[in-house]
Amino acid sequence: MCIRDSSRTVPYISKVTGVPMVDLAVRCCLGEKLTDMGYGTGLHPNAPYVAVKVPVFSFEKLHGVDTQFGPEMKSTGEVLGIAPNFHDALLKGLIGAGYTFKTPGPASCCIFTVKDSDKPEFVDIAWKLKNMGYKLYGTSGTCAWLNKHMVPCNEVRNMSGEAPNIVDLLQSGLVDYVFSTSAKGRDPKRDSVRLRRKAVELSIPCITAVDTANALVNCLRSDHSMKDIPLVDIATLYHKK
């Protein structure tokens, strides 16, 4: 297996397992065997915690760059969330990566503009946000899809449409989250690219992947907060052999 960002991944794996991956790999290359180094060939024992690695992006410093994910490396760092269970570890990681968890106000809203292949998965996500008290807005295709599947949604004109449009809604201060998985591209004039850039400029969290959207919404719906999650002493994570 080849990991493109192994220079980032391996240190995290070593930290949370207590296994010095690089040292062992070098010694194996020099002819030693794992059994001679005190390690077996089976699975490493389960730890009493879960570790989640979350990428960090600096799109506000990268002018004109589309925030939609692709094969290119766009993250500028990563944070590690460690907790006794997956949910708390994910919450730690997302907060450490800069995601905000807001309580919806009377007029708080979310914007949806997603590609056709993602629309079925966003029905449940949109329902959860609606039940939390958010008002939902969507561009024409996304709005029609959500309403068709019994999720109340209001249509908003795209960036190239007449005012009032999605730009006015973004600038209203009422938008807590933008969910945009629509077409990515290098053309900065595309509506989808301009929307994501505008969200970044206004410091509005812009979610561009279904799995991230699911993770964020599940954290929003939980009763947990950072005050409820215990700290993990990272010095105790190492298991000497």
Give the location of each predicted region.
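General beta-strand structural signal in soluble alpha/beta enzymes
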Residues: 81-82, 112, 136-140, 155-156, ...
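ATP-dependent carboxylate activation and anion-phosphoryl transfer catalytic cores
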Residues: 4-105
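Short connector loops at secondary-structure junctions
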Residues: 141-159
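Glycine-rich phosphate/diphosphate-binding loops that line cofactor/substrate pockets in enzymes
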Residues: 96-110, 129-131, 169-175
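Peripheral docking tails and interdomain loops at the edges
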Residues: 157-241
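Short internal beta-strands
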Residues: 111, 129, 133-146
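A general structural motif
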Residues: 86-92, 114-118, 136-138, 157-167
